[in-house]
């Protein structure tokens, strides 16, 4: 977040349990200087799950990305929001991760010819992590919202 907070050429979007370590990511943290408004933090309450995340992605991320028109989309995928992960207290499932990936893939398809990079960030229940990564990588899941 802080790497790009003053950069209007990067749209940074984050959903995360709040309050939680490291204590950043308040909704009021929205960038600085020329980058103000290009950082979007959506704090989530403990226990929120698939429907809550889908709603935030559809109501907040999609309109922001459509206005921004990215040339490349990068996902830093934190799987510690999985309902079985010991680090956080969120309620995402494998299907939820697949749906969120499809939403983001749709943004990449509309604005940057599908240029999408995804990296693994977190996830500490290895069974849930493996299942979530495998589920979101299935082509039918990505095609679902790209069409």
Annotate each predicted stretch with a short phrase.
Residues 1-147:
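A general "terminal functional-core" signal
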């Amino acid at each position: 977040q802080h790497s790009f907070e003053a950069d209007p050429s990067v749209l940074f979007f984050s959903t995360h349990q709040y309050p939680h370590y490291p204590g950043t990511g308040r909704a009021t943290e929205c960038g600085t200087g020329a980058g103000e408004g290009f950082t979007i933090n959506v704090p989530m309450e403990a226990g929120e799950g698939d429907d809550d995340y889908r709603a935030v992605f559809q109501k907040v991320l999609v309109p922001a990305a459509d206005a921004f028109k990215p040339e490349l989309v990068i996902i830093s995928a934190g799987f510690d929001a999985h309902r079985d992960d010991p680090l956080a207290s969120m309620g995402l499932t494998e299907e939820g991760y697949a749906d969120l990936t499809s939403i983001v893939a749709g943004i990449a398809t509309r604005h940057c010819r599908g240029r999408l990079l995804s990296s693994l960030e977190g996830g500490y229940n290895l069974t849930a992590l493996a299942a979530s990564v495998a589920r979101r990588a299935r082509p039918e899941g990505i095609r679902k919202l790209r069409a």
